[in-house]
Structures are given as structure tokens and as C-alpha cells.
Curated annotation (Swiss-Prot):
Region named Disordered: 63-84
Membrane topology: Peripheral membrane protein
Protein name (Swiss-Prot/TrEMBL): Putative membrane protein insertion efficiency factor
Family assignment from sequence similarity: Belongs to the UPF0161 family.
Organism: Streptococcus mutans serotype c (strain ATCC 700610 / UA159)
GO CC term (a single one): plasma membrane
């Protein structure tokens, strides 16, 4: 099942993505995130990847957003240091 979900993403990475300029606002890129999420969480990881793609637009800051170890559709936010 995982291979079936990952194959179209690999196709996109190899043949479609190089045609366009880089535009993903996150690290890892949305396609790399989706592959890692599928490998960790299966079908739920696919949903996590779709949610990530929907978050990737010009009005978001972006930045580091690694795949969490637990299923969530929200961004994996880091704790910000408190200002003293």
C-alpha cells in the first residue's frame, strides 16, 4: 500500500518538479514530507501530506516542519523561547 501511495510522489519529484522553480516554504519539502509521513504512518501519513500541501501557500511563514512521530493534521510547531 505504501509503495502505491509513494510512486506518484516520486514521479512528481523526478519529472514534474524540476520543470518549475522551487516554491515550497517548508523544510523538508512538501513532497519529501509526504513520503516520510507515508513511510511512518501509512494512509494517515498520506492525509498528513495533503494537509501539509494545503498549508504551503504565500501567506504562511514556512520553515522547519518535520514529520511528527504521532498522527496530526496540524503543523509540528517548536516551542519558542519565552522572553524574560
Amino acid at each position: 500500500m505504501k509503495k502505491v501511495l509513494i510512486a506518484p510522489i516520486k514521479f512528481y519529484q523526478k519529472f514534474i518538479s524540476p520543470i518549475f522553480p522551487a516554491s515550497c516554504r517548508y523544510r523538508p519539502t512538501c513532497s519529501a514530507y509526504m513520503i516520510e509521513a507515508i513511510e511512518k504512518h501509512g494512509l494517515k501519513g498520506f492525509l498528513m501530506g495533503i494537509a501539509r500541501i494545503l498549508r504551503c501557500h504565500p501567506f504562511v511563514e514556512g520553515g522547519e516542519d518535520p514529520v511528527p512521530n504521532h498522527f496530526t493534521l496540524r503543523r509540528n510547531k517548536k516551542e519558542k523561547p519565552s522572553k524574560s
